[in-house]
Amino acid sequence: MRESRLWFWHILSAIVILVLLGVHMGTMHLGAILSSIGIGSGDPVKSAEVFHRSQQLIYMVTYILLLGAALFHGLYGLRSMLLELSLSKGLEKAIGSVCAVAGVLLFIYGSYVAVMLVRMPEVRP
């Protein structure tokens, strides 16, 4: 039952990654098309544009959601591959614990960075 639930979250995280990377690709790589319909705002990789996006709450939420989904998806996938090596139960538990702790620590650090970017005072390039 536990593995089925984890697998469900693994698939759900893949869907979240797919949607959020679609938004990223649209924002970063389809600027000309978006500008032609009035959504784009110039060159998306200029430092002023990057900083402007990082100051917006919606982008912070998007970054944190993508971070969480990518960390879970990647670390659960890594854990699943390692558990297929037919290791001892103790080692399997240790691998699961290391992946979980690494995921939580990386999520906390990444979320902290995203929040600090929103709270940064505006910098003029």
Predicted regions and their residues:
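Membrane-embedded alpha-helical bundles that constitute the cytochrome b-like, heme-associated redox core
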Residues: 1-125
